[in-house]
Amino acid sequence: MTDSAPHSAVAAGLATVTPAGTVLDTWYPEPRLGVPAGARPGTTRLGALEISGELGPDYGGLVRRDESRGVEVIAVRTVIPDLAAAPVDTHDVWLRLHLLSHRLVSPRSISMDGVFGLLTNVAWTSAGPVEAATFNVHRLRAALGHVTVFGVDKFPRMVDYVIPSGVRVADGDRVRLGAHLAEGTTVMHEGFVNYNAGTLGPSMVEGRISAGVVVGPNSDIGGGASIMGTLSGGGKQVVSIGSGCLLGANAGIGISLGDNCVVEAGCYVTAGSRVTLPDGSVVKAAELSGRDGLLFRRNSVSGALEALPRTGTWGELNAQLHAN
């Protein structure tokens, strides 16, 4: 269950580090909120006896040097005393990403300030993470045989670290670690969920949920639909979608939707869009942000973008598709 006001967190995990000390990843199998009294803030390397006590007897064999990848896997304990403060290092960021994907915290409830500057560009391979700057696929294949490179990025696939209960993810490449997928969520092949974003209840995701975006229960993000984030382009609107909403195929929004709203297929509503109301007045879409029960559509005769009170129903989610 998501903690709406988390304060601190602790976890033991396995980190992949280079000879220069660069942290490529840290896997925390069982993160938890709250910090034991007297716990030392930051990340501490665990000794052989501590590994069994904190991670379990099966994890000791995973601590090793891997010459083929040029890395060492070490056991660590990370303590974050204040989740409202910005992350201080790479381990700190990785624990926060795990907290989100384990659904221990909800998107936007903890600080993720400065995460890009603390993460390393990594080649994510079937043999494990490799530093992108020194990656040599020929050397790796010579040592290990066939190796698949899934991508080169600072964020890995969520499914390689966390598989939340009660969800379907048709294509693991489309969901980043740090995504928050509520039980009953289905992410289809063309859906995408960024870190510090996601769903709060059963949802159909066939479009893009950008960083910082939260989608309420029983909402449908249609195929090719786009929800604007704030990572680039100067956007300042923090977008959320309420419960029971439909964002139609190839539609898009740069404003928040309240509950029970519909955006017609192919209709894009940015914060600065001029919207005609039923009384003939025209307002910026930002003035309608977060309101319940609206239908946004493009008038097929005049071409004007309109907002009307909702009537009827869009059909709602198919319960059989979300019994995961």
Swiss-Prot record:
The active site is at 206 (acyl-anhydride intermediate). Keywords: Acyltransferase, Amino-acid biosynthesis, Cytoplasm, Diaminopimelate biosynthesis, Lysine biosynthesis, Magnesium, Metal-binding, Transferase. Its EC number is 2.3.1.117. Succinyl-CoA binds at residues 208, 223, 226, 249, 264-265, 272, 284, 297-300. The keyword Signal does not apply. Mg(2+) 2 binds at residue 190. GO terms for biological process: diaminopimelate biosynthetic process; lysine biosynthetic process via diaminopimelate. Its main location: cytoplasm. CDD domains: LbH_THP_succinylT_putative (cd04649). Mg(2+) 1 binds at residue 173. InterPro entries: DapD_actinobacteria, Hexapep, THDPS_M, THDPS_M_sf, Trimer_LpxA-like_sf, Type2_DapD. It is found in: Cytoplasm. It is an enzyme of class 2 (transferase). GO terms for molecular function: 2,3,4,5-tetrahydropyridine-2,6-dicarboxylate N-succinyltransferase activity; magnesium ion binding. It comes from the Bacteria. It catalyses: (S)-2,3,4,5-tetrahydrodipicolinate + succinyl-CoA + H2O = (S)-2-succinylamino-6-oxoheptanedioate + CoA. Gene3D superfamilies: 3.30.70.2010, Hexapeptide repeat proteins, Trimeric LpxA-like enzymes. GO terms for cellular component: cytoplasm. Homotrimer. Belongs to the type 2 tetrahydrodipicolinate N-succinyltransferase family. Catalyzes the conversion of the cyclic tetrahydrodipicolinate (THDP) into the acyclic N-succinyl-L-2-amino-6-oxopimelate using succinyl-CoA. This is 2,3,4,5-tetrahydropyridine-2,6-dicarboxylate N-succinyltransferase. The gene is dapD.
